[in-house]
Amino acid sequence: MADQAPFDTDVNTLTRFVMEEGRKARGTGELTQLLNSLCTAVKAISSAVRKAGIAHLYGIAGSTNVTGDQVKKLDVLSNDLVMNMLKSSFATCVLVSEEDKHAIIVEPEKRGKYVVCFDPLDGSSNIDCLVSVGTIFGIYRKKSTDEPSEKDALQPGRNLVAAGYALYGSATMLVLAMDCGVNCFMLDPAIGEFILVDKDVKIKKKGKIYSLNEGYARDFDPAVTEYIQRKKFPPDNSAPYGARYVGSMVADVHRTLVYGGIFLYPANKKSPNGKLRLLYECNPMAYVMEKAGGMATTGKEAVLDVIPTDIHQRAPVILGSPDDVLEFLKVYEKHSAQ
């Protein structure tokens, strides 16, 4: 043990990992620039989330601090951080955020070839009770040669170049999915870098946990009601599934990825088109799941096949372990045929 160094002198950071992947693909390095800038925003948000109580960032947009500056709510602050960092990466041309009604077109002198759709602080409505929150992102290549516009963001999830999320939990983790698979990076606060901790992550074929908001049970489709009953009272007398629901999509999906099982936010009578947003919630998570060997469906088609018509379009989503999602689809198709 005496000859063991206290530090790993050859750590694989996210920057190094993306540079290596870019080199294999003979890329221009633009995606590396983009992800580096995104990482900086994530580190800043992570710091802000941890300091929120002390810095009075909880739900007080409009108040002023001791120097007379406007104090921003965490989600507004997070949005500004991601926007500014992505613009300054010189790799983006169109930015779509949950916080902005219209797409943001990057100034000509800062433009690059990528379109980024993101939710800067998913689950922020839960932050007052210290529930884990996160940042979700999806990166597309601009397809047209025209001037950048909102239309450039209206691409199906199949066109994603990279997607993922940052989870601000007991530690800060960044999960990145690209063609090479899904990789997890943990923020080491000692050196301020994301370190590769889980390589080529694969989800279990079948899990033991289901996750959805059962408070909406009254409005569920019969197919969803039947599927949940099967999880609670399995027809073959096997052990029932455990129920876990945080209400923060990043936390619920990350647990599903790590432990296996199924996450559902289906359409219901109140929200016939689903509630989660396709471009910056459903698509990135569906991409992560598929790259990890899982599945993601709306019930009618794969989430990644949905062609968006609006940047804030909603979609139902059922994702997770392939066997669990297939079982849901079997029940869903049975009810659709009736």
UniProtKB/Swiss-Prot annotation:
List of residues binding AMP: V18, M19, E20, E21, G22, T28, G29, E30, L31, T32, K113, Y114, R141
A single GO BP: regulation of gluconeogenesis
Cofactor binding summary note: Binds 3 Mg(2+) ions per subunit.
Annotated substrate binding sites: 122-125, 213-216, 244-249, 265, 275-277
Modified residues (N6-succinyllysine): K151
Entry EC number(s): 3.1.3.11
Pathway(s) it belongs to: Carbohydrate biosynthesis; gluconeogenesis
Residues found modified as N-acetylalanine: A2
Binding site for Mg(2+) 2: E98, D119, L121
One Gene Ontology term of the molecular function aspect: monosaccharide binding
Cofactor or coenzyme needed: Mg(2+)
Substrates-to-products reaction catalysed: beta-D-fructose 1,6-bisphosphate + H2O = beta-D-fructose 6-phosphate + phosphate
Induction context: Up-regulated in pancreatic islets of individuals with type 2 diabetes.
InterPro entries per record: FBPase_C_dom, FBPase_class-1, FBPase_N, FBPtase, Fructose_bisphosphatase_AS
Modification Phosphotyrosine occurs at: Y216, Y245, Y265
Keywords, comma-separated and alphabetical: Acetylation, Allosteric enzyme, Carbohydrate metabolism, Disease variant, Gluconeogenesis, Hydrolase, Magnesium, Metal-binding, Phosphoprotein
Binding site for Mg(2+) 3: D119, D122, E281
A Pfam family hit: FBPase
Similarity comment: family membership: Belongs to the FBPase class 1 family.
Protein name listed in UniProt: Fructose-1,6-bisphosphatase 1
Species annotation: Homo sapiens
Lineage, uppermost ranks: Eukaryota, Metazoa, Chordata, Craniata, Vertebrata
